[in-house]
Amino acid sequence: MAKVYIKTYGCQMNERDSEQVARMLVERGHLITPHENEADVVLLNTCSVRDLAEQKALGKMGMLGALSRQRPVVYGFLGCMAQSRGESLFKEIPHLDLVVGTQKFHRVAEYVENALARKAGPRMDDVRFSIVDVEEEPDSQGSIRDHLLSERQVTAFVSIMQGCNMHCTFCIVPFTRGHERSRPIDQIVDEVKRLVDRGIREVTLLGQIVNLYGRHEFPKMDGRSPFVQLLEAVHAVDGLDRIRFTSPHPIGFRKDLVEAFHSLPKLVEHVHFPLQSGSDRILRAMHRTYTAEKYIKLVDEIRTVTPEMAMTTDIIVGFPGETDEDFQSTKALVDRVGFDNAFVFKYSKRKDTPAASVLDQVPDRLKEERNQELLALVNDWARRRNAGFIGREVEVLCEGPSKTNPARLMGRTRGNKIVVFEGASRHIGQLLNIRITHASGYTLYGEPAPVNAGASPALAQGSLLRLSFRLGCGGQDGAPDREDRANGFDSSSGRPEIGNR
């Protein structure tokens, strides 16, 4: 039995992939440890959306090489950076043993055991004995389906597709994740049913561009897209209370999806709606396929059908050629929409993407100035939106203790607002009415009034360690309070939605 340390950089899809890897390792008798210093195996699941994420992973792996002075340790890079850099990573990290790409997560446990066996024999550091697998795998989209749930866990990610065909000019995701591939609806529904049987009450459906699910594999039915058909099928699962999805693309928001927020009560009032820029000129250069006017029209259509809709977004500042006029257009659109929150990132060159070769690159100093200016506007809107909840009662799914004070509980509203409140362990897994008493920029605080006095439904059993795979890779630079950071939002390293779509 080996002790395995897994650290994840990047989006929710990466977190879900890490969970799959952990589940397979546990099934083979290995132990997942949160303590890197006691690990026999170190796996870093990587992100390539921005250079900062890659540098963090490379730096971490370099530092952890010191463990091998104490005992044999297997080191592996997984995921997007592994896919994009491949065998070249061995030149940067000499002690590396494994490089496994985005379509081979289901092979990681096997490769780890091969490397462990090799380490137990005569010492061999030659790169020829290392394992590299970044090849395409048919039907790999169906390989991420098993879960490692903690005791009393009530939310889960469900991967419904892989890949992206949009080829935005700034984005490396189509190169690291491949073309769009979707799982069958019945397979996804079966996974959700198994999760509900184990105590899960909320699922988040994941895809690089999640609302384009199934467009190449499955037909429309009565004007409903395959994604809306999937939402309807998941909605019919007994015992499930909430459905979320991320990350969509504006091009996939058609009338049937907008109306689904009204017709499907389990579909929560929150949408992450990537903008990237408020300038039509920059949107064309990004190959985003919509205009600022079209984006605002979609926002208005969504809010007409669902007035309580919470909206978050992704924005890139300093894209090549961005002028002050372009940036002011972005600020104006942000002010027009009034987002509940936004992940704001400085443009990062990605190798082999069209934008990287543009000569008119924006200076780093100007990127930083625009980043801070836009963040001030975003944070102001976040505070205003949250202040509007003071004195109101909201429905909260209680997820567990606050990470800074186990005597307090935390959960999320249907609009994905973090709420911290006083309560008891029996509230975990329950839907509660919480009266909001005060708010910070990113967290609501309140007093509970349970919807039901009865016992909560059966919760996930067992003693498996709840895995903590999260590490943001973004560039949002606000200053949330200590409670905000601990309960899932640190704006100094704001995690992007999937692939920063």
Place the predicted regions along the sequence by residue.
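Terminal RNA-binding accessory module
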Residues: 357-477, 483, 487-490, 498-501
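Short flexible coil/turn linkers enriched for glycine and charged/polar residues
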Residues: 150-154, 164-166, 267, 277, ...
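Conserved, mostly hydrophobic/aromatic
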Residues: 168, 188, 205, 245, ...
